[in-house]
Structures are given as C-alpha cells and as structure tokens.
Amino acid sequence: MLFRTFKSLMIALVFGAITASAQDFDPIASRRLTEYQMPATTQTHEFARVPDTNIVLLSQMSNSNLVKIELDPTTEEPIALHSFPMGKDSDSGLHGVWPSTVYPGKVWLSLQLENKLLLVDPGKESWIAPTILQTIDIPAPGNGPHCVFEIGNRIWAGLKEESEQTGKYYVFSADVSDPTDHTLYECLKSPVFIKEEPTTGLIYVTQDTDSSIMRIDVTSGETEQLPIPPSVGNTAVGMITAYGPMSGVWFTLAGNATGGTGTFGHIGSSGEIEFFQLRHPLGANSGLLHLADATTEDGGPALWILSTSLLSNDSPDALIHVTFDPDVTSVADEEYISMLTQHSKVHRVVPLGSTVLVSELSTFTLAQLSYSNTVAGQWLPAESVSDSAVYAEAS
C-alpha cells in the first residue's frame, strides 16, 4: 500500500513537472515560404483571388491559359488546380486579371495579342471552365491591352503594343455597361498600371520604357507627364491605390539591365511625387516591380514590395515588408524574404487573409509566405544578430 502511494506520488510529481515545464516555454515564432508548381510554361504573369471564394485565377501569357487554383479555406494553401485555354489559340496573349466590383463574382481578363478584353464568370469550383459573358474589342488605333482595371463604372487598360496605325501608345477607358462610350488617351511607351488617387479622383498611369507617370483628368480629358528623374531611378511599373494613413497612389521603379536603386514613390492629393528608398544594403540594387498595401491596425502603415530579376540578374528576387513612421514620411524598418528560386523573375504580389502569394514569371511557380506566432514586420533580421540593438529589441 505504501509502495503504491509512493508510486502515485512520483507519477503526479513527474507529470506536474512536465506540465509546468511545457507551460514555461514560449511558442516558437516561424515564417515559411512554400513554392507551388503551376503548369509548365515560359511566362506566368498576373493573378487575383475571386472575392468571397477560395479560388485564385492566374494568367499564363505564353500559352494563353488561365489557371484556376483552389485554396484551403483555413490555411489558404493551394490544394488543387485546373488550367483552361483562353482566346482563339495559344497565341492570344492572356495577361491581365482583375475582379469586377460592378459585377460581383465576375472577372476581367485581357487578351493582349487579340486586342480584346473579356468579362468572365470563372465558375465556383476549380474544375469548372470559365464562361465568357462579354467581349470588348479595343478600337483603333489602340493595340495590346496588358493590365486591366475596373475603376468606378469604367474599365481601363494600358495598351502595351505599338499602334499599327500611328506608331504610338494609348490608355483605353470605357463605360462598363456601354463600351461604345470609350476614350483613348495618347501616352508614352508603354502603359502598365492604372490607378485612381482617392482624394482627387485623378488617374495615374505608369509607363515603363519611357520611365514616366501620366496623370489623367477624366473630367477635362487633359493629360500631363511626370517624368522620373534618372538620378532617382527608372522604369515605372507597379502601382496601387492606398487609403487611410497611406492615402494616394504608390508606385515602383524596376531599374534596368544593371539593376535598380531600391526606390519607390508616392503621389498624394497634392499631385507631387515623393520618393522613398530602401535603407538596407540588401535592397541597394533592387529593381522593384510590384507592391501591395500591408497596413494593419497593430503594425501601422506598411507595404509589401517585390524586388525582381526581371530586368537584371544583379537584382535579387525577394519579397520585402516595409514599415513607415506614423506620418508616412520615412521608412522605419524593412524585412527581407529571399525567394527560394533566384532568377525566377518574380512578378506580382497579392496578400490574402493571413498569407501572401507571389508569382514567379519564368519558373511557372506560385510562392506563399506564412507566419506562425509572429507577424510580418516583427521578424528579427538574421544578418544583424551580432548587433546589440537586436538583442535590446528582442529582450
């Protein structure tokens, strides 16, 4: 009896010690980057999540296929995919993908080499083929819709191909419900992203080759060019509209064959360009291609920015989380996530609910970044572990 009592006491003490020991441990912070292989092709471009669904649509331009990707509803991990040809043949040049707000659940696509825009019903399941609901032919002299966007009740597209009639480049805009109500704005070579400044309602367009941003007053029809100073950088590409403390349009400079300058910019209601530059040596030669708003209530104003090897192998393929001071006048901190496959020419970044997706143009891959027991912007920089400031921050 005494032995049994002693044995029970020892078991209780050991179990209690294990429980107490387990409770003393803090959860381990981790971040994970996972690559998901898409159907093999040479150019994997744009993608977007269909709102209120677990479906992501991804364009592959080199074979004009639309990949429908199903996400796990809890983890957001890709779990299934099906690919569908779009256009008359594999040379139709599927590129732009943009969810419609006017037509909820529907998505705009661009066929760059067919000179068309499509409104499609993607279907609620990954194996269901998209249904074309509307086709908009780009009128002459416009040619080659690249990226497509819906702003208010109008559809916009940057026409990236040189006009066969005039040798010039244009931005296309049309009423969503009446495409015959359209306008072509002459621009420089060549328009990519088109966004609205939320306070003024002015439209801004990045033009990559001629490294300038065009401003459009849709009321008067007047346009104005805002050249990028060569001393700052070149090749304006990515652009987003942001609200709240980040209000305005933000854009990136992708650099050239020798790399980039780690520079991005902001245009607010004043219409003036304010440039920002990455401070960390890792970003010094980065060509910045695309970006997304990463602002959170707890973390404050922030951006996700893609550094890409698209124009130069001297520019790393990386996803960068940039935070700002409360007034958004200077960069406060940077977190670098090097892509697993370098020289993959990372192309677009799209935040989901709790994870972030990145497309890799030349390796038919979709990468996903996820965090556990921490959040973006709180990861301590590995390259500074010997810095006393890091120990102070971690303590």
Regions found by a protein language model. Name each.
Residues 23-42:
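A short helix->beta-strand "capping" segment at the edge of beta-propeller domains
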Residues 50, 57-62, 101, 108-114, ...:
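Conserved beta-strand positions in repeat-built beta-propeller and related beta-rich domains
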Residues 65-69, 115-121, 164-173, 211-215, ...:
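Structural motif
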Residues 320, 338, 347-395:
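Blade-level signature of beta-propeller repeat domains, shared across WD40, Kelch, NHL, RCC1
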Residues 1-22:
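Fungal secretory targeting signals
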Residues 39-52, 87-103, 139-152, 158-161, ...:
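Beta-rich, blade/repeat-based domains predominating
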Residues 32-38, 79-87, 129-138, 180-186, ...:
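A short beta-strand motif characteristic of beta-propeller blades
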Residues 70-75, 121-126, 174-179, 217-221, ...:
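Short loop/turn segments that connect beta-strands within beta-propeller blades
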